[in-house]
Amino acid sequence: MLECENLSCTRNNKVLFKNLSFKAELKSKILITGPNGSGKTSLIRSLSGLLPPVSGNIRHCGKDIYDDPKSYISSMVYIGHKNACKDSLTVAQNVEFWAGIRNTRELIVAAICCLQLQPVLNIRYGELSAGWKRRVALARLLISNANVWLIDEPFCNLDSATCELVLNLISIRSEQNGIVIITGHSSTEQLCDFTTIDIRNFNRLLV
């Protein structure tokens, strides 16, 4: 379980949200919604261990993620707006690099096949379209073999077919006792089975 208790976060001395609490049980799919600048990215970065909250606690399996970061990082994968890929490397080299970090080289073929990356494997990442770049970055979900997926706007720059593919991967991960938390501007019909947290509800608590 991933549990947040009374989280507050600031950016440039401005409070983004305050006293935000929720629990993500195994098999959870959670959508964090809100307009640009409302704190969605800051929240998911806090959940990833990259941005300590001003106050409150985040616990994974009962342990504060900031007290035991190594244990948490090994069970979590975070994909932000920046795709964290090297432009000078080919797609294949990027995938191999991630697998080397996670010691999961046995998952390379499955990740390539699931994200249908075969046509671009030998192309430098920097030469790809925005859609292909995002698809390559999402391969990290499978390469990581992580139980917790944190994805900031996963469908950005993707066509409808790839969006459906990613939704299927998310469903499979959650069904396998995973936890998936994503951000988006609003809920849609395709995301109707996600538990929605509107971050604006916690913006209104500011004093």
Curated annotation (Swiss-Prot):
Major enzyme class: translocase
Pfam families reported in the protein's UniProt record: ABC_tran
GO cellular component: plasma membrane
Record key words, sorted: ATP-binding, Cell membrane, Cytochrome c-type biogenesis, Membrane, Nucleotide-binding, Translocase, Transport
Catalytic activity: heme b(in) + ATP + H2O = heme b(out) + ADP + phosphate + H(+)
Domain ABC transporter: 2-204
Coiled-coil ranges per UniProt: none
Positions contributing to ATP binding: 34-41
EC numbers on record: 7.6.2.5
Entries under PROSITE patterns matching the protein: ABC_TRANSPORTER_1, ABC_TRANSPORTER_2, CCMA
GO terms for MF: ABC-type heme transporter activity; ATP binding; ATP hydrolysis activity
Cell compartments where the protein resides: Cell membrane
A GO biological-process term: cytochrome complex assembly
Membrane topology: Peripheral membrane protein
NCBIfam families per the UniProt record, alphabetical: ccmA
Assembly, per entry: The complex is composed of two ATP-binding proteins (CcmA) and two transmembrane proteins (CcmB).
Record-stated family: Belongs to the ABC transporter superfamily. CcmA exporter (TC 3.A.1.107) family.
Role this protein plays: Part of the ABC transporter complex CcmAB involved in the biogenesis of c-type cytochromes; once thought to export heme, this seems not to be the case, but its exact role is uncertain. Responsible for energy coupling to the transport system.
Protein name: Cytochrome c biogenesis ATP-binding export protein CcmA
Lineage of the species this protein comes from: Bacteria, Pseudomonadati, Pseudomonadota, Alphaproteobacteria, Rickettsiales
Gene that this sequence comes from: ccmA
